[in-house]
Amino acid sequence: PTLDEVLQTIPNGRKIYIEIKCGLEIISPLLNQLSESSLNKDDVVIISFDAPVIKALKESKPEYKSLLLYSCEDNRNIDELIDDALKINANGISTDNESSQLLVDKILSSGLEYHSWTIDDSEVARKLIQWGSSSITTNDPKSLIQKI
């Protein structure tokens, strides 16, 4: 399906997370598509591993929520990651963290939101919710919801 077709399927009050996997060239066409859709800006979350993409998005349309994606395999200094997210005006950081409450606490104490991906284990999901994760991306939402 096209992005426009997908946007039309999102029920009122539900969120869509759009991951940008390419570069800056997508920002303008994406924002045009979003502005033509009937979605409320509060229901759109843009996510990317690419800090310049998030920065450009926030400079163009700061009202859209954005999350900087981070893979724990990258083993970055968390304070530097938080500083980078704050510099580009990201609303939060989303990681594949399953075991570090300290990481979650540091992100939340900086004023940023914390989000989780891709979590399919209900015990891990329950723990991340207790730690303060605002959202959890999963491959099996129905099963995960039933278990937690």
Model-inferred region functions:
Residues P1-D74, I88-E98, L108-S110:
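Metal-dependent phosphodiesterase/phospholipase catalytic core, i.e.
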Residues L68-I148:
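C-terminal active-site rim and adjoining tail of enzyme catalytic domains
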